[in-house]
Design a protein with these regions (language model features):
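Acidic, surface-exposed loops and disordered segments
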Residues: 1-137
Length: 137
């Protein structure tokens, strides 16, 4: 079994923007200066602008998209997973040495194979019906 800790970035810096521009230019085989407008938009909107205050929240949302892909991919490979949100990010950050970094623990996911001795693994799963959960309007 493995415990995967997914991290979110707390802020976006000019160095992050430069890295994105360089990577984009390289991938697209274009001159980086052709992306100056894009780089300026990132600076004005996401680094210096009011949206800089919500980057951490946005980054957390992006982590959950990655988590969804992790859960789906693992299921396709027959690997059991359990997403864990009820943990102490501060303690995980301390253990992982992230306290002074620009990254923060966001969600944890246990991955592995269930024990054949697990008496709960074969019990019927309790789920609400679609009618209980979905309202059509």
């Amino acid at each position: 079994s493995h415990l995967v800790v997914l991290l979110k970035q707390r802020t976006i810096t000019g160095a992050d923007a430069d890295r994105l521009i360089t990577s984009t230019a390289t991938t697209r085989s274009i001159e980086a200066n052709l992306l100056d407008g894009y780089r300026q938009m990132i600076q004005v909107d996401l680094i210096d602008g009011p949206r800089s205050q919500i980057i951490g929240q946005w980054a957390g949302n992006q982590v959950y998209i990655a988590l969804g892909n992790l859960l789906t991919s693992a299921a396709l490979l027959g690997v059991d997973t359990c997403a864990i949100e009820g943990f102490s990010p501060v303690d995980y950050d301390r253990i992982l040495g992230l306290e002074t970094s620009d990254y923060q623990s966001c969600v944890v996911c246990a991955c592995g194979y269930r024990s054949s001795d697990d008496k709960y693994a074969s019990l019927a799963k309790v789920r609400y019906t679609a009618n209980d959960l979905i309202e059509h309007r």
